[in-house]
From Swiss-Prot:
Protein purpose: Catalyzes a salvage reaction resulting in the formation of AMP, that is energically less costly than de novo synthesis.
Family: Belongs to the purine/pyrimidine phosphoribosyltransferase family.
Pathway of action: Purine metabolism; AMP biosynthesis via salvage pathway; AMP from adenine: step 1/1
Matching NCBIfam families: apt, PRK02304.1-3, PRK02304.1-5
A Gene Ontology molecular function term of the record: adenine phosphoribosyltransferase activity
Identification of the protein by name: Adenine phosphoribosyltransferase
Species assigned in the record: Burkholderia orbicola (strain MC0-3)
Length: 188
């Protein structure tokens, strides 16, 4: 963690970056897992992180913040609360109790599906979609597609971390979804 002299201004992005733990070779050899639990354990880091998102979206005239299962559920409801807007969960298949719409997407080995309640938002609602991290972009793209199928205007995709070497943020931008991330890490 970088040290600063007393009274020196804090660089919020550098501070957030320093609070994320890297776990080598998890969940499989060669993967550098970016663990946000250390960031969440620090009241100061959590406050700074939430403030960064709130400052970005306070004037965006949002109706909802959508969070992607599972780690997107951690930060998205806090940001929604701070912005005084609703929270929309986008869950893994089979986890929502009411009528749903689903969207499948490809993974490196296989595929996955996410769902949203069919009444989660209405045409014209302005929504941002949040997750902890953007890697390949598949989950966020599927979430964006679900929200658009309900008629929502997806204003932006937001995450704490970008892994640009995996191409997800570029894929999302090329598909017309603006992306905001607080920090990035090289590699995967």
């Amino acid at each position: 963690m970088p040290h600063s002299s007393p009274g020196a201004p804090l660089d919020p992005v550098a501070f957030i970056h320093s609070q994320i733990r890297t776990v080598p070779d998890w969940p499989q050899p060669g993967v550098q897992f970016r663990d946000i639990t250390t960031l969440l354990q620090s009241p100061k880091a959590l406050r700074i992180l939430v403030d960064l998102f709130v400052e970005r979206y306070v004037d965006a005239k949002l109706d909802y913040v959508a969070g992607l299962d599972a780690r997107g559920f951690i930060i998205a409801p806090i940001v929604a609360y701070e912005l005084s807007v609703g929270f929309v969960p986008i869950r893994k298949v089979g986890k929502l109790p009411y009528k749903t719409r689903s969207e499948s997407y490809d993974l490196e080995y296989g595929s996955a599906t996410v769902e949203i309640h069919e009444d989660a938002c209405k045409p014209g609602d302005r929504v941002i979609i949040m997750d902890d991290l953007i890697a390949t972009g598949g989950t966020m793209m599927a979430g964006r597609n679900l929200l658009q199928r309900l008629g929502a205007e997806v204003v932006e995709g937001a995450a704490i971390i970008d892994l640009p070497d995996l191409g997800g943020s570029t894929l999302l931008r090329n598909a017309g979804l603006p992306v905001y991330t607080v920090t990035e890490f090289a590699g995967h």
